[in-house]
Structures are given as C-alpha cells and as structure tokens.
Amino acid sequence: GFFSLIKGVAKIATKGLAKNLGKMGLDLVGCKISKEC
C-alpha cells in the first residue's frame, strides 16, 4: 500500500545518496593523492 511505496522511495533515495557520498569520497581521496585540491 501507501506505506510500502514510501519505504520503496526511501530505499531508492538512500541508495542514491550512498552512491553520491561514495563518489564524493573517492574524488576527495583522489585529489588528496594528486595534491590538486
């Protein structure tokens, strides 16, 4: 029902957020290694 729909959207949102945070983390590590911050 409605609640499961919200749970599904929340799950997708968390996945997207985790992916974005992971990408940002990788970018930060890469810039620290190459000293191009």
UniProtKB/Swiss-Prot annotation:
Q: Alphabetically list the UniProt keywords.
A: Amphibian defense peptide, Antibiotic, Antimicrobial, Disulfide bond, Inflammatory response, Mast cell degranulation, Secreted
**Which Pfam families does the UniProt record give?**
Antimicrobial_2
Question: Where in the cell does this protein reside?
Answer: Secreted
| Cystine residue pairs | 31-37
Asked if the Swiss-Prot or TrEMBL record annotates the protein with the keyword Cytoplasm, the reply is: no
Q: In which tissues is it expressed?
A: Expressed by the skin glands.
Its principal location?
Answer: secreted
GO CC terms for this protein? extracellular region
- Which processes are annotated in GO (biological process)? defense response to Gram-negative bacterium; defense response to Gram-positive bacterium; histamine secretion by mast cell; positive regulation of mast cell degranulation
The UniProt family comment states: Belongs to the frog skin active peptide (FSAP) family. Esculentin subfamily.
Q: What does this protein do?
A: Mast cell degranulating peptide. Causes histamine release from rat peritoneal mast cells in vitro. Has antibacterial activity against the Gram-negative bacterium E.coli K12 and Gram-positive bacterium M.luteus NCT C2665.
What is the name of the protein in this document? Esculentin-2SE
Which organism does this record belong to?
A: Lithobates sevosus
